[in-house]
Amino acid sequence: MWNRLYQYNEEERAIRIKTYFKFLFVREPLKRLLSAYKDKFIGGDAQLSRLDRRYIINKYRPQDLNKNENFVGFAEFIKYFSEDIPRNQHWRQYEKLCHPCLVNYTFIGHLETMAEDAPLLLKTAGIDDRVTFPPIHASTNTDEVLEYYSQVPTEYTKRLGELYRSDFEMFGYEYLGAVKPLLRHNTSKEDNSNR
């Protein structure tokens, strides 16, 4: 239905990059990773994550590989991700996936403020009189983020922060902001245990 940019020759790509209305919606990195995990490992397309599941189980629980046990917990997924950085479009850094430093996007919106950003996008594109956005509902709340990331050792959460640092900085997200309360709590627990 849609051609991808790489399907065009260099000249055709340059014309499209220069003349097309280009927009991008981004999401807070840690929330995006949680959403991808839930979609690919809890629900969604089991075939898509089958190889990832087998790899993770083989790496961290090889004794379970040939059993019927194929559930991958969030902490296992994060450990795998922070050590191996799989090249999957659902969790790859925006910097590498969308190339915001190379493409001059006309509009960049945030998923967290999509209800406000979507009408502005349509107005900027000059189509607000012909198109409307459907109602938008937030999909990942703060309590859920904290619940999932509380299962993850602090060192891996911090490693994720470094992997996604450019996404935090480029798009105005507070560095590790979604899990700051958790990190403060874990740091104070570590400080108390060292006394």
Q: Residue locations for each model-derived region?
A:
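Membrane-interface amphipathic segments in extracytoplasmic regions
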Residues: M1-R195
